[in-house]
């Protein structure tokens, strides 16, 4: 009888997001081996013991405090390390310091002989995903960012609450930057085939400006959480586990991720949030959604801002790249 494939994950960054992601992996029985890397070694040691204490009630898993060299035979390296977003800061404000942190991570991971898939969650995620691709020299299909996964989930939640349906039954996407320039695709977003925009028109009691209100609520949700409790981690930690499961289980699932543009939406040389198909080999297909003129303009504006910030940050930090 052939042995079952052992899935191994190396998590880099054991802060609020990283530890929540690790707990989600344990709770859902995702992967059989998890190594945790962080600049604070004792924290990873403590988390490894604490997380292992949860396994008797779920599924066996080898969990340990790891080094970068342990990535050599990993299937997935997940990067959540970076300076956290503070009250009043945008995700783009983090770019220079987190580019430098990222450079110190990617280089030793690549030097370890790692030949798997990078999944990036640190912010600004679109820029750091593109930077990981450039720093690593990896093929584009093996560097993926969490993109607008969390934003899309928030949108589905808000629409579900409004229409009194399960958020999992809401077909909706947020596209663009995981940040202030993201936008909902109202020309597509629907529940059971009925566009949300048409539903709002049929229910005037929700208000004629409801679509704009939903957009603002979703885009500002992170700021609201950060102002109240200091950081966001449950939503993104769970979203990361969901992406991980889709990759390791070869689900060929469509998810809103930060992926490379090669002419989609008229964009090039940038990673940005759009639906994409992922499986065990990483990125399988980038899906270009049909957008109306207003949405296309928003996508271009989002990409333009990302590109300007990214190019300036690469120049100012002088981080080493391979491509």
Swiss-Prot record:
Q: Which top-level enzyme class is recorded in the Swiss-Prot or TrEMBL entry?
A: oxidoreductase
Which residues hold NAD(+)?
Answer: 17, 38, 43, 68, 82-83, 104, 121-123, 146
Alphabetical GO biological process terms: glycolytic process; lactate metabolic process
Task: Report the transmembrane regions from the record.
Answer: none
Q: Oxidoreductase: is it a keyword of this entry?
A: yes
One example of the protein's molecular function in GO is: L-lactate dehydrogenase activity
Family named by the database record? Belongs to the LDH/MDH superfamily. LDH family.
What is the annotated role of this protein in its UniProt record?
Catalyzes the conversion of lactate to pyruvate.
Name of this protein: L-lactate dehydrogenase 1
Gene, per the UniProt record? ldh1
